[in-house]
Amino acid sequence: MASSSLSTLCSSTSSSLHPNSKLSHSLSAKLSSKANVSVQFLGKKQSPLLSSTPRFLTVIAMAPPKPGGKAKKVVGVIKLALEAGKATPAPPVGPALGSKGVNIMAFCKDYNARTADKAGYIIPVEITVFDDKSFTFILKTPPASVLLLKAAGVEKGSKDPQQDKVGVITIDQLRTIAAEKLPDLNCTTIESAMRIIAGTAANMGIDIDPPILEPKKKAVLL
């Protein structure tokens, strides 16, 4: 019924258009009964179907969704921290992905290929799993602690960072690390990122030369 009314409207509207208008000859032929159509008349506020005066009109047609165009549903998000280029089906990868039905070998192959140039680093990855068992993933930057240890040339941080210092990095090294971590930090400037990374370094017993943070002062009770 709606389709029939629409065809009648289009035919009547087409006949009321200016005789030389190309739209008047093709409007009815081009509009699909499956399309959602909005017809807007521009000009004086009077019925266009009852007037013999030519009218301009705007036709907005929206095509129906394509077959199979249904959006995928996210069924899980998995976060892992893996060594670059060395992902295998062994834990933690296998159990984490297997429980969601993800193709484990396909993930390992893709992850290793995308991190091959970062050998020696731990690269966090966030995997989004969909209801059809397909997946996508994004790589994060290495943890700041890993970058700081690499820059300082030490294997681990200090158990007592205030008293036992394990290494020193330069201000240029700090800036390089801050620039790399900036996309994952809750700040927008390199200076703010440097202060955040410097705080992490201080908690690990790694000094910055020259320092950019004021030393903590112990409160003295009188």
Curated annotation (Swiss-Prot):
GO molecular function (one): rRNA binding
Cited SUPFAM superfamilies: Ribosomal L11/L12e N-terminal domain (SSF54747), Ribosomal protein L11, C-terminal domain (SSF46906)
Protein name stated in the entry: Large ribosomal subunit protein uL11c
InterPro entries listed in its UniProt record: Ribosomal_uL11 (IPR000911), Ribosomal_uL11_bac-typ (IPR006519), Ribosomal_uL11_C (IPR020783), Ribosomal_uL11_C_sf (IPR036769), Ribosomal_uL11_CS (IPR020785), Ribosomal_uL11_N (IPR020784), Ribosomal_uL11_N_sf (IPR036796)
UniProt entry tagged with the keyword 4Fe-4S: no
Main localization, broad class: plastid
Chain positions covered by the region annotation Disordered: 1-20
UniProt similarity note: Belongs to the universal ribosomal protein uL11 family.
First and last residues of the transit peptide: 1-62
Pfam families for the chain: Ribosomal_L11, Ribosomal_L11_N
Compartment(s) of residence: Plastid, Chloroplast
Subunit structure: Part of the ribosomal stalk of the 50S ribosomal subunit. Interacts with L10 and the large rRNA to form the base of the stalk. L10 forms an elongated spine to which L12 dimers bind in a sequential fashion forming a multimeric L10(L12)X complex.
UniProt lineage: Eukaryota, Viridiplantae, Streptophyta, Embryophyta, Tracheophyta
Keyword Membrane: no
Gene source species: Arabidopsis thaliana
Gene Ontology terms: cellular component: chloroplast; chloroplast envelope; chloroplast stroma; cytosolic ribosome; nucleus; ribonucleoprotein complex
Function as written in the Swiss-Prot or TrEMBL entry: Forms part of the ribosomal stalk which helps the ribosome interact with GTP-bound translation factors.
HAMAP family: Ribosomal_uL11
Keywords: Chloroplast, Plastid, Ribonucleoprotein, Ribosomal protein, RNA-binding, rRNA-binding, Transit peptide
SMART domains found in the cross-reference section: RL11 (SM00649)
GO biological process, one term: translation
